[in-house]
Amino acid sequence: LAKGKDIKRVQKMVIDLQRTTDALTRKDIKNWRDAWQYAINVDSPSRQRLYDIYRDTEIDLHLSGCVEQRRGFVMARSFKIVDMKGDENEEAVHFFDQSWFKQLMRYALDSIYWGHSLIELGDLYTDGDGCICYSDVKLIPRKHVIPEYGRVITDLGQDWTTGIDYRQPPFSDWLIEAGRPDDLGLYLKAASQTIPKKNMLAFWDTFGEIFGMPMRIARTTSRDQKEIDRLDKMLREAG
């Protein structure tokens, strides 16, 4: 494992990332295709736009329900660690039957949908049972990771060649990759369906606001044509 000064370097790399707010703007199929094109650019790949679309994709009710159901089934399963003879090593299981490992599994499962994910292990400590554990497991912000070249950039839009090579020590001792470097995740396919679905719901909402209101009827006892014309104009302007 990394020495004390190396641990500080790893932690500093994460702290120095200049986080930005995700753009919650309306997306369409053209945005999806353009984002895909940016992500597969050979010279300067960038998944930033694609992740903005994925953020919209994951809130789809049906899709999120399917994802959570699958995650629940996997996380509910028990596991065991065996040696070469097939005998279970209960002591080894105790090291992994901890909250940090469950969080690691969640991030690994998410990588199936989001694509490549870079996971950071926290500091080592000893729990009440004398078991060595990691204090936390965190996900390196995906927009800052260029998995095709194994780099982490501190600022969005930064040239990947100036980023930190996380596949070399000491960073490789504390960072775990989930998914292939070129994996864009299943949300790439799902987005082509959730984007039109969300937009059509917005269109129907607008349609309902305009045409879903009951018909307005105005009655008057006046026979004055000016009064009738004024009432007619008022109804027309009301929509």
Q: What kind of region is each of these model predictions?
A:
Residues L1-A2:
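Glycine- and charge-rich intrinsically disordered segments
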Residues D60, E68-G72, A76-F79:
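Active-site acidic/histidine clusters and adjacent loop/turn architecture
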Residues D6, Q11, I15-N41, P45-Q48, ...:
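Structured, contiguous alpha/beta core segments that scaffold functional sites
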